[in-house]
């Protein structure tokens, strides 16, 4: 089973790796299992930059390229993912995280996240 990294995990991996748990760090470094990042995370970063809640050292495009150069794979949003979002229980209110949960369910991915609300859904969480 491959991994899907939550947005904060992607940011911490590149900017503040000391914030990652040992299990999260190990999962990110496990070359035998692919690590995906969602286009929804890229969108979330763009929104946070616009709201001045986040600043990257370079552009969003440079950040995405850096992730890809480290072996992370970009996961697009499929219509089936949005269909799943429409029926998910409202345990989690963040629309970006709800989409990540739907993607994890649809693509059979384990999610690397510190967010405990993910545990309320039928997915495997690594932290």
Which stretches of residues belong to each language-model region?
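Active-site regions of enzymes building and remodeling cell-envelope glycoconjugates
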Residues: 122-127
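Short, well-structured N-terminal submotif of metal-dependent ribonuclease cores
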Residues: 1-37, 51-65, 69, 107, ...
């Amino acid at each position: 089973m491959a991994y899907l990294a939550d947005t904060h995990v992607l940011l911490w991996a590149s900017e503040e790796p000391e914030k990652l748990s040992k299990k999260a760090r190990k999962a990110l470094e496990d070359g035998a299992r692919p690590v995906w990042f969602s286009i929804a995370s890229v969108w979330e970063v763009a929104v946070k930059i616009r709201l001045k809640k986040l600043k990257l050292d370079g552009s969003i495009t440079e950040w995405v390229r850096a992730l890809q150069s480290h072996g992370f794979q970009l996961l697009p949003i499929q219509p089936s993912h949005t269909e799943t979002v429409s029926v998910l229980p409202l345990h989690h209110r963040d629309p970006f995280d709800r989409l990540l949960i739907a993607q994890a369910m649809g693509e059979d991915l384990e999610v690397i996240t510190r967010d405990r609300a993910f545990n309320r859904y039928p997915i495997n969480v690594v932290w």
